[in-house]
Regions:
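Glycine-rich phosphate-binding loops of nucleotide-dependent enzymes
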Residues: 2-272
Length: 272
């Protein structure tokens, strides 16, 4: 395995009843890169992620993770986390009625010599985690006190503190405004600089070109291709996702849109 590669998926195949969800799909993620996983609805993106995170058991292929000896054929979600694979979804999977510190350390709380939770240590460590990521928040406050964007960043901070090597962000910007998206991108670039490999799933093409280094395109459960961001113009990306001829899409794009004047009637309703 290349020293610069943190994750390799080879020949991943999976079938649902009557549907070939994934057909011999390859995917490679490098250390310290943001890699977009693109495709229309039903292309196989979610299924591939679920195979990677241990939710789905795939029928053929293998996964290799940096630092783990030998291939991973199938593993559980817990196994995936232990290998350094973490996912943050658009719907934050944390506990809103618990404090930020409790959410950061849930299931792995520091203990005193008596076996009780060491609250002081947990708060201190939690505050350092968020401070190191330039998140201006009070970890003693309940999670629900913060915006969805900050909640997602807290979920990312938890993953990072659990020594994640591969961070999957599945439609993280769907409910965020432009300012919140910029904050998320800043955090993503900080993690990139630390060597974390990030898989970014989104339908917003402008965001892909704003923050990603490479793009992998899936269509109908198959790999279309893997491209450096600078070598794949948007219209070619759309063509790859849709399975359309590039020249046809370019011709459509070049056609002039009709120009309407004040005298043109667009809608006319009478006697309603």
């Amino acid at each position: 395995m290349d020293n610069n590669v943190v994750l390799t998926m080879r020949g991943i195949s999976m079938t649902f009843p009557g549907v070939k969800a994934l057909d011999n799909v390859d995917f490679t993620l490098r250390k310290g890169e943001i890699h977009a996983l693109m495709g229309e609805n039903g292309a196989g993106k979610s299924t591939l992620i679920k195979c990677l995170t241990g939710i789905n058991a795939f029928e053929a292929g293998e996964i290799r993770v940096d630092g783990i000896d030998g291939p991973v054929v199938n593993h559980s979600t817990l196994d995936a986390q232990k290998k350094g694979i973490s996912t943050v979804y658009q719907e934050v999977n944390l506990c809103p009625n618990l404090s930020v510190a409790e959410n950061l350390f849930i299931g792995r709380e520091p203990k005193t010599k008596l076996g009780t939770i060491d609250w002081k240590t947990m708060v201190k460590k939690s505050q350092k985690i968020v401070d190191d990521l330039d998140m201006n928040i009070d970890v003693t406050q309940n999670l629900e006190e913060y915006s969805l964007a900050l909640q997602q960043m807290i979920a990312i901070a938890r993953a990072v503190d659990m020594d994640c090597k591969v961070l999957i962000l599945d439609e993280p910007t769907s409910s965020l405004d432009d300012n919140e998206v910029e904050k998320l991108f800043k955090l993503m670039n900080q993690l990139k600089a630390k060597g974390v490999g990030i898989v970014f799933v989104t339908h917003f093409l402008e965001q892909v070109y704003a923050v990603c280094d490479r793009i992998t395109v899936l269509r109908d459960g198959q790999l279309v291709g893997e491209y450096p961001i600078a070598e794949l113009p948007r219209v070619k990306l759309v063509a790859a996702m849709m399975g359309k001829d590039f020249d046809d899409l370019a011709a459509i794009k070049s056609e002039e849109s009709p120009v309407f004047t004040d005298d043109d009637i667009l809608i006319d309703a009478e006697g309603m």
